[in-house]
Curated annotation (Swiss-Prot):
It comes from Oryza sativa subsp. japonica (Rice). The gene is SAPK3. Autophosphorylated in presence of Ca(2+). One of its GO terms (biological process) is abscisic acid-activated signaling pathway. This is Serine/threonine-protein kinase SAPK3. May play a role in signal transduction of hyperosmotic response. GO terms for molecular function: ATP binding; protein serine kinase activity; protein serine/threonine kinase activity. Belongs to the protein kinase superfamily. Ser/Thr protein kinase family.
């Protein structure tokens, strides 16, 4: 790994471990690498993320490149999105204009629609999992397929996964649900946040109270503040997305025909739809599924921490202490 890639900086951290920006010494290409500690952290979610992600080739989805092993970690190498998270853009701007929100929403729906066409539902769509490529006219890049499920490979989802603010009512029931329909709800939350600058089902006075958020999700209690100017077409679309009964919720194909969605639709999206999503620019995955599965199995064996990169160990130690603080905060919320 170290012979092939030169580490440049940390990009972020989460429950999984650390993500770093690295340079491919051969091609000079910048790529992102997600490091997951070998051993018990290499579970079904990690395997699912890698296998599902490998099969996806679409301009609005972060490209999977390969998996490697280090003495201590499983490393997932993927396309680098230089523009960062869409979430950060909203934090900076406060909220987007309706036209800006539509521009990003159109790309999000294009990427999600492609996943669904391959029978893959994401199950954790949110602004933090929506990156930008850094170009002057930013291209959305969906990432993080750790909770994704493939109808071809896995059973119907019934576990409660995802981020509280984005979870659909049926996901909270702990019964089987259609992951594609739940993804539509999460796309609606993303659209609302872009337009309003806050979450639709959080109590503004008590945003960290997850119980209150869940109660409002189940009751579909949301409103658009008076100070936010949103067209009637857009309001109608949101009201068709935020429907508690999943069988009555608008579907992705219906969203793609909606008047509001079709306005100023970028030519590349409409042309891609006609071409049935074939991303001709994308090279096919170089690693065979069999090789990936072999690497994953090997990664389930704990690594030799004595051989670890000291900088990576320091980042992981810092992450652990942050996680402990966050867990304490969440405990206080209940």
């Amino acid at each position: 790994m170290e012979e092939r890639y030169e580490a440049l900086k940390e990009l972020g951290a989460g429950n999984f471990g650390v993500a770093r920006l690295v340079r491919d010494k051969r091609s000079k290409e910048l790529v992102a690498v997600k490091y997951i500690e070998r051993g018990k952290k290499i579970d079904e979610n990690v395997q699912r993320e890698i296998i599902n992600h490998r099969s996806l080739r679409h301009p609005n989805i972060i490209r999977f490149k390969e998996v490697c092993l280090t003495p201590t970690h499983l490393a997932i190498v993927m396309e680098y999105a230089a523009g960062g998270e869409l979430f950060e853009q909203i934090c900076t701007a406060g909220r987007f204009s309706e036209d800006e929100a539509r521009y990003f929403f159109q790309q999000l729906i294009s990427g999600v629609s492609y996943c669904h066409s391959l029978e893959i539902c994401h199950r954790d769509l949110k602004l933090e999992n929506t990156l930008l490529d850094g170009s002057p006219t930013p291209r959305v890049k969906i990432c993080d397929f750790g909770y994704s499920k493939s109808a071809l490979l896995h059973s119907k989802p019934k576990s409660t996964v995802g981020t509280p603010a984005y979870i659909a009512p049926e996901v909270l029931s702990r019964k089987e649900y259609d992951g594609k329909v739940a993804d539509v709800w999460s796309c609606g939350v993303t659209l609302y946040v872009m337009l309003v600058g806050s979450y639709p089902f959080e109590d503004p006075g008590d945003p960290r109270n997850f119980r209150k958020t869940i109660s409002r999700i189940l009751g579909v209690q949301y409103s658009i503040p008076d100070y936010v100017r949103v067209s009637s077409d857009c309001r109608r679309l949101l009201s068709q997305i935020f429907v508690a009964d999943p069988s009555k919720r608008i579907t992705i194909p219906e969203i793609k025909k909606h008047t509001w969605f079709l306005k100023n639709l970028p030519k590349e999206i409409s042309e891609r739809e006609k071409a049935d999503y074939k991303d001709t620019d994308a090279a096919p995955p170089t690693q065979a599924v069999e090789e990936i599965m072999r690497i994953i199995q090997e990664a389930k064996v704990p690594g030799d921490m004595a051989a670890a990169d000291p900088a990576l160990l320091a980042e992981l130690a810092e992450l652990k202490s942050d996680d402990e603080e966050e867990a304490a905060d969440e405990y206080d919320t209940y």
